[in-house]
Design a protein with these regions (language model features):
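Conserved catalytic-core segment of nucleotide-activated headgroup transferases in glycan assembly
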Residues: 177, 183, 203-297
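Donor nucleotide-sugar binding/catalytic pocket of nucleotide-sugar-dependent glycosyltransferases
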Residues: 132-135, 142, 161-216
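Short alpha-helical segment that forms part of, or immediately flanks, the ligand-binding pocket
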Residues: 292, 313-320
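Short N-terminal targeting/anchoring amphipathic segment
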Residues: 99-119, 132-134
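Acceptor-binding helix/loop patch of EC 2.4 sugar-transfer enzymes
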Residues: 8, 67, 71-88, 133-173, ...
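Short Ser/Thr-rich beta->loop micro-motif in glycosyltransferases that lines
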Residues: 286, 303-310
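A conserved catalytic-core segment of Leloir-type glycosyltransferases
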Residues: 39-101, 105
Length: 321
């Protein structure tokens, strides 16, 4: 079978995000003899990993990750957008054309949009020929928005969410209805989508972990440290760190003078750096080539959760390590 994957984050073996699950789907399908292609967004930090991924693919086309404008420059468009914010952050008209040209060139049997934001390139894409369309929903955008509104009802972002959440729901579920199949990672996520539209065709493809890569390190005395991993451009991850740094960390470091906190992953936000301040015991690494070595170093892995939906694959990685 010929399968084209779409991803908003470049998937490779060392990526610290849910895109690592996408990488292993691609790798295992290619090993089984399928013809697999990839269209994805990337940043400069992904460049060292491109050759290894290209080697397992039939073809690969990459575009720079869309750059977000200052929200004040987009006012009032940020209140009344054509596309809801959750989709506009991953929108590039060039990706519409790219997906269409790749499908025509290679005659793919199916296109899999990983993460709901990439489903927009299968829905109302004027360049896309007839092809089976699958959307892999890692988390429901509408449920995530409603949860954020309940958690921080008076935050500036939530005023925008209140104004646009019904529009988000309409766009998200029109997109799902246009697909031939929806994939979720858990049964709970499947039921959540069916709550909005019981007629959706949904299958569950569970999350996995590479136990050859994430495995217990040789016996040694770990450093007195906490480890938190994630792709911090995603608000649930950055919000969780900011909450932990302001609420829990002061209490912990006062009782454990030698304790360190390692924050491992790309997409670190200004709000995260402000929350860390000048604390020398908080180490924000940014992108790393080997997250497993940090998991082996730490005494405790933490995964605070306040927002978002979906499955946290990093918990499986920490358990395996």
């Amino acid at each position: 079978m010929k399968i084209l994957f779409l991803c908003n984050v470049f998937p490779h073996a060392n990526v610290v995000s849910g895109a690592i699950n996408v990488y292993h789907r691609i790798r295992l399908l290619a090993q089984r003899g399928h013809t697999v292609g990839l269209a994805a967004f990337k940043t400069g930090a992904d460049d060292p990993h491109i050759p290894a991924v290209r080697a397992i693919l039939h073809e690969m086309e990459l575009l720079p990750r869309p750059v977000q404008q200052n929200p004040f420059r987009r006012f009032p468009g940020n209140l009344f957008p054509i596309l809801p914010h959750d989709f506009s952050v991953g929108y590039d008209p060039a990706m519409h054309r790219l997906v269409g040209s790749m499908v025509d060139r290679t005659r793919y049997d199916v296109v899999v949009a990983e993460f709901s934001v990439m489903g927009q390139y299968l829905h109302h894409n004027p360049y896309l020929s007839a092809v089976r369309r699958v959307i892999s929903c890692h988390s429901c955008l509408t449920t995530s928005a409603l949860k954020a509104i309940r958690l921080r009802p008076y935050a500036p972002k939530c005023w925008r969410r209140r104004l646009t959440v019904q529009r988000l729901r309409a766009v998200e579920f029109a997109m799902y209805r246009s697909a031939d199949l929806i994939l979720t990672l858990t049964g709970e996520e499947r039921l959540d989508l069916l709550k909005y539209d019981p007629d959706l065709s949904i299958e569950i493809v569970p999350y996995g972990v590479d136990t050859e890569y994430f495995k217990p390190a040789p016996a040694r005395d770990p450093e007195d440290s906490l480890i938190y991993t994630g792709f911090f451009a995603q608000e649930p991850n950055s919000d969780a760190f900011i909450w932990f740094a302001r609420t829990v960390w002061p209490w912990l470091k006062a009782r454990h003078p030698g304790l360190k906190l390692y924050v491992v992953g790309a997409g670190v936000t200004r709000g995260m750096r402000e929350a860390a301040g000048n604390d020398q015991r908080i180490v924000i690494t940014g992108p790393v080539d080997d997250v497993a070595c940090y998991l082996a170093r730490g005494r405790i892995f933490i995964c605070p959760i306040r927002m978002g939906t979906g499955f946290r694959g990093k918990i499986l990685q920490a358990m395996a390590a």
